[in-house]
From Swiss-Prot:
Protein name: Flagellar hook-basal body complex protein FliE
Keywords: Bacterial flagellum
Keyword DNA-binding: no
A Pfam entry, by short name: FliE
Superkingdom of the source species: Bacteria
GO biological process, one term: bacterial-type flagellum-dependent cell motility
GO CC list: bacterial-type flagellum basal body
Record-linked InterPro entries: FliE
Gene Ontology molecular function, alphabetical: cytoskeletal motor activity; structural molecule activity
Subcellular localization(s) per the UniProt record: Bacterial flagellum basal body
Similarity section: Belongs to the FliE family.
Keyword match GTP-binding: no
HAMAP family: FliE
């Protein structure tokens, strides 16, 4: 059940980050700050994180299938669902980006 506790902690961390982001508006500047990551970097990191989540889920499922001790079915299912949800979220982000690109391309100049 340690994965359940880990999931709850992850959700609490995400909510805390969301509240921090919403509470402190940042000034808009024309130049990018030194050391600040671009949107492309953030998107690349998100893709890598989803790939790592899927790989970890696959490894856990394989360990369960071969009967490795200490691997519980609930852990496998939770890991699989995490990978699925993260992939679906990434797919939605991609769809929104494609739609935004198409909208911009259809704008009259």
């Amino acid at each position: 059940m340690s994965k359940g506790v880990e999931f709850n902690r992850l959700m609490l961390d995400m909510r805390a980050m969301q509240m921090d982001a919403m509470s402190a508006p940042k000034p808009v500047s024309g130049a990018q700050e030194a050391g600040a990551s671009s949107f492309a970097d953030m998107l690349g990191q998100a893709v890598n994180k989803v790939a790592q989540t899927q790989q970890a889920s696959s490894q856990l499922a394989n360990a369960f299938e071969i009967g490795k001790s200490g691997v519980d079915l609930t852990d496998v299912m939770i890991s699989s669902q995490k990978a699925s949800v993260s992939f679906q979220a990434l797919t939605q982000v991609r769809n929104k980006l494609v739609q935004a690109y198409q909208d911009i391309m259809q704008m009259p100049v």
